[in-house]
């Protein structure tokens, strides 16, 4: 898989910061991840020139000098003293907020600054990945973002409805294997938790506080009724509500899964072997897995395709089959 541009630039910055001397272009091509993908010396040279210009545009002090007194070849390095940031320490909430903001900002005038800031933070060893921190970020107003680039098409509509205090109506399903049902909700805010978006609000149909994953909401979200009809109750902690909903705890249930011989190593490690078994003429074994999150387990098993087959429970098997059919349909 080809290395992304941002990852390649981060690798280059780290390499040029880690040396007191100068590194030749040839050494960079052979040792810095992302450049070995170049099909030719000419292609590498063009890519490297673009990357050098980009680093300079970002304000990174790239220096050029002779590799040694006996070697006239030019090399490159980054002046540590000029580049060094004062110590940057972000709390989990702050780190997650930075990462979420970069997902939301898409305007041309912001994207360069966003990528530049991320590049400097990551190269300085600052973790800004919400999937790693696991920290949730709550957004209760469309004013919190200037542009939307998320995969959830309904996010902008929900944020506008939250701003105006309008009730929303949409179709929703609890899992891929279940049918959609129409829900009428007083929206309070949206929260990102472990890379997913959730709507928190009062479900009028259930007369209770509910959490809805945005990826399970249908494409049509309709604001209904007058503006100002809903308010967020005082003292409501959106992040706490979502965290309690999605936190993985033992359910007491077990899944029985067949895995092909030599495949699905991570799944094998997580489970307990129940003995060898052939399935469809293939050698393998049956493993037992504790179900902490049915959704997460279904996603993981789906990723192994025909190398992992759910035997029990039926609900998990149906969920995995629905995901596989959806993937096959998308590729058709």
Curated annotation (Swiss-Prot):
Domain of life of the source: Bacteria
Phenotype reported upon loss of the gene: Cells lacking this gene are not severely sensitized to RNI and display no accumulation of the proteasome substrates mpa, FabD and PanB.
Residue ranges occupied by any WYL domain in the UniProt entry: 147-227
Bilayer-crossing regions: none
GO CC terms, sorted: peptidoglycan-based cell wall; plasma membrane
Pfam families: WYL (PF13280)
Family: Belongs to the PafB family.
Task of the protein: Part of the pafABC operon, however PafB does not seem to be involved in pupylation or substrate degradation. Appears to play at least a small role in resistance to reactive nitrogen intermediates (RNI) in vitro.
Subunit composition and interactions: Interacts with PafC; with which it probably forms a heterocomplex.
Protein name in UniProt: Protein PafB
Organism: Mycobacterium tuberculosis (strain ATCC 25618 / H37Rv)
Gene: pafB
């Amino acid at each position: 898989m080809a290395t992304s541009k941002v990852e390649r630039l981060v690798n280059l910055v780290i390499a040029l910061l880690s040396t007191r001397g100068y590194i030749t272009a040839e050494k960079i091509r052979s040792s810095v991840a992302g450049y070995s993908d170049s099909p030719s010396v000419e292609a590498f040279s063009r890519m490297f020139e673009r990357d050098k210009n980009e680093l300079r545009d970002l304000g990174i002090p790239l220096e050029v000098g002779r590799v040694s007194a006996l070697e006239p070849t030019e090399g490159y390095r980054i002046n540590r003293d000029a580049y060094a940031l004062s110590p940057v320490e972000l709390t989990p909430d702050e780190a997650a907020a930075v990462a979420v903001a970069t997902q939301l900002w898409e305007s041309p005038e912001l994207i360069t600054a966003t990528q530049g800031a991320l590049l400097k933070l990551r190269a300085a060893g600052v973790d800004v990945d919400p999937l790693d921190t696991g920290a949730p970020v709550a957004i209760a107003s469309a004013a919190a973002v200037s542009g939307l680039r998320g995969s959830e098409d309904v996010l902008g509509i929900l944020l506008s409805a939250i701003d105006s205090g309008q009730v929303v109506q949409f179709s929703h399903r609890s899992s891929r294997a279940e049918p959609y049902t129409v829900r009428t909700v007083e929206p309070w805010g949206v929260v990102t938790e472990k890379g997913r978006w959730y709507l928190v609000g009062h479900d009028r149909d259930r007369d209770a506080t509910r959490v809805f994953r945005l990826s399970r909401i249908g494409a049509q979200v309709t604001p209904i009724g007058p503006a100002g009809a809903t308010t967020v109750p005082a003292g409501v902690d959106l992040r706490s509500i979502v965290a309690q909903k999605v936190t993985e705890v033992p359910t007491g249930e077990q899944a029985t899964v067949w895995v092909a011989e030599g495949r699905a190593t991570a799944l094998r490690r997580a489970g307990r072997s129940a003995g060898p078994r052939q399935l469809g003429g293939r050698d393998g074994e049956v493993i037992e897995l504790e179900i902490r999150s049915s959704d997460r387990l279904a996603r993981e098993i789906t990723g192994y395709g025909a190398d992992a087959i759910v035997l029990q429970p039926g609900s998990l098997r149906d969920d995995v089959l629905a995901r596989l059919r959806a993937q096959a349909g998308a590729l058709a």
